[in-house]
Amino acid sequence: ENNCLTILNPAPARKINEENFALLDFFTPNETEAEFYLKNKITTEEDIKIAGREFLKKGVKNIIITLGERGVYFANENEEYFIDALKLKDQVVDTTGAGDAFNGAFAVGLANDLKFKDALIFANKVAGISTTRAGAASSMPTFKEVNNY
């Protein structure tokens, strides 16, 4: 109505009226949350692609499934691809808040007019860096840290 993009990160997963999927521009579950909504186990790359297509059939315009150390999957009616996880310079310390880091960074990327894929790459990088630190909010990197990583 007002040309605003909608992003729903369903964490934690809760029942959603399926007709509301069509209202979403971006739906960003992780693997576990995607399994909750589709009632299917998602383990292989092919399972992920099938899940993505199922969400599109439900009306989601753009599906993003975060895959932790395996990266992220994206699909819409025109394209489908995987983005590898960031090759970390440091050990993973704590994954708390990584999904929040991803979603916040993705929204920032879109707000700064990045193309979808570039916003996903940026978000993936932010989430990866956040796992190398303890905590949730305290683990979020600055723009400078992301650009220098």
Locations of regions flagged by a protein language model:
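Conserved phosphate-binding/catalytic region of the ribokinase-like
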Residues: K15-N20, E45-Y149
